Amino acid sequence: MAVLPLLLCLLPLAPASSPPQPASPSPCPRRCRCQTQSLPLSVLCPGAGLLFVPPSLDRRAAELRLADNFIATVRRRDLANMTGLLHLSLSRNTIRHVAAGAFSDLRALRALHLDGNRLTSLGEGQLRGLVNLRHLILSNNQLAALAAGALDDCAETLEDLDLSYNNLEQLPWEALGRLGNVNTLGLDHNLLASVPAGAFSRLHKLARLDMTSNRLTTIPPDPLFSRLPLLARPRGSPASALVLAFGGNPLHCNCELVWLRRLAREDDLEACASPPALGGRYFWAVGEEEFVCEPPVVTHRSPPLAVPAGRPAALRCRAVGDPEPRVRWVSPQGRLLGNSSRARAFPNGTLELLVTEPGDGGIFTCIAANAAGEATAAVELTVGPPPPPQLANSTSCDPPRDGEPDALTPPSAASASASAKAAEAGPPTDRGVQVTEHGATAALIQWPDQRPIPGIRMYQIQYNSSADDILVYRMIPAESSSFLLTDLASGRTYDLCVLAVYEDSATGLTATRPVGCNRFSTEPALRPCGAPHAPFLGGTMIIALGGVIVASVLVFIFVLLMRYKVHGGQPPGKTKASAPVSSVCSQTNGALGPMPAPPAPEPSAPRAHTVVQLDCEPWGPSHEPMGP
């Protein structure tokens, strides 16, 4: 029991345990300034010449400024674990790529500046994790596409979205319509050509909308515009006012913009680009009575059309008006027609029935409508019984004969079939096409006049030889009834057909009708004994000239050898007697002395040729040397 009081006395003397020390901060990156003495922590690296995000960042930083550098890529690990970051600036770099999930750890981030970079698209995963983002600045990039789900994580918190100065032609308007807390929306200086009606109807807190310098020709009325007053000056606007800017667009001033003209604005410089009567005029100076539209007028429709069952049919309807009318089709049963498995409706007013059935016949109604009214036109379609299997793109009652090419038979199959039938049955029966003259390389083709066929545009001649399956086509004017074929191969058999190309008044389509076919053979080419070809002559001349040169060289060498032998093996002009002669004629001391006798020539064997020996005459007394 005495130990317990002793322990109680020693307990206050025990050293108190020290609290845990905070982790040492990371060193400040080179060329950066770090404010770590007071909260919040900041890392400032503007204009530091950085090529990438510094890896030694303090992960506790609340502000990171990396503007005016040369960063090209934002990687997943660059900003990892920076859960307390509130402000991130990457403005005016060379960023082309942002990795998916690069900002996924920045759940506290409120402002992200990516303006002045080289981004071309923004995908769904690149902004993932920014659940508290309020300011997103993407201006001055090269954005051409914005994914529909790119803003999903920040749709409920985003207050400021700047997409200006990009290359956007389309926007995910439904995704933008979900930004219920956005106050400022910058869409200026893009390539937007249209805005769907009701695109801003759910943006109840929108205070400024900038759509200047786009390609908008009209702005549809929106419930947002009717609820809030429109003022041009943002400074003097009340808190609930909406500032709308749409200058620099090619506005088409018609009745669709009357709602905008009725709003009092004084300091915007919008102008009309069309119609021509109002082009260039100040938008707010044009009276309301001049914003007019023209009702549609149907200018063209298909005539009554008759097609066999199973064939396609095209119904056409053209209309004009201001604004451009929209064309719709109604079936004989009163149903509105659109794109389906059996029909296709085109924006130009054409309705194409891919496969007609007997029940499709009746009166089709074309309806052209715009803001000023609508116009209708009726087009009758008759669907007859299906054609015989042999018919192919022809309204003639005579089916094509076996082996005769038509519009639906491939050329190779047609020629092969024709050749096979010809081998069995001989030449085909003439159907009006005559080959009146033919030689080795040419043939004159004639056919009867086809005036009974209305609307003939031209004739088509197609032929091929027995050694070639490729068809050759010739287009002949409708006024002609003959044609001279040239460049044919000699000694070959040709299959030839003539077709009339005309416009079928019943269908309004271009059709073909066979005029006739024929088979002929070109004459074999003769082999005349003419002059040799130029290449042969050239080779012969070269060989002859070379032979002459070689013979001349041989003769020259032979002459030199003969002269060498004649002079006893010495070059011409240098004989044995030449040495004494030269010594005699030499002058040493200015006086002439007696010349010694020349040495006797050495005996030599007799030669068959003449030997020339030169001797000098003896000097007389008068030639004695002179005294001193």
From Swiss-Prot:
SMART domains attached to this UniProt entry: IG, IGc2, LRR_TYP, LRRCT
Cellular component GO terms held in the UniProt record: axon; cell surface; dendrite; postsynaptic membrane; presynaptic active zone membrane
Domain Fibronectin type-III: 427-525
Membrane topology (UniProt): Single-pass type I membrane protein
Record has Signal as a keyword: yes
Compositional bias (Low complexity): 410-428
Biased composition range(s): Pro residues: 595-604
LRR repeats: 60-83, 84-105, 108-129, 132-153, 157-178, 181-202, 205-226
Keyword vocabulary terms for this entry: Cell adhesion, Cell membrane, Cell projection, Disulfide bond, Glycoprotein, Immunoglobulin domain, Leucine-rich repeat, Membrane, Postsynaptic cell membrane, Repeat, Signal, Synapse, Transmembrane, Transmembrane helix
Superkingdom, taxonomy of origin: Eukaryota
Single GO biological process annotation from the record: cell adhesion
Cystine connections: 317-366
Extracellular compartment residues: 17-540
Localization of this protein: Cell membrane; Cell projection, Axon; Cell projection, Dendrite; Synapse
Compositionally biased tracts (Polar residues): 580-590
Glycosylation sites: 348, 393
Cited Pfam families: fn3, I-set, LRR_8
Residue ranges, Cytoplasmic side: 562-628
Similarity annotation: Belongs to the LRFN family.
Function: Cell adhesion molecule that mediates homophilic cell-cell adhesion in a Ca(2+)-independent manner. Promotes neurite outgrowth in hippocampal neurons.
This protein's domain notes: Lacks a cytoplasmic PDZ-binding domain, which has been implicated in function of related Lrfn proteins.
Subunit structure: Can form heteromeric complexes with LRFN1, LRFN2, LRFN4 and LRFN5. Able to form homomeric complexes across cell junctions, between adjacent cells. Does not interact with DLG4.
The name this protein goes by in its record: Leucine-rich repeat and fibronectin type-III domain-containing protein 3
Species of the source: Bos taurus (Bovine)
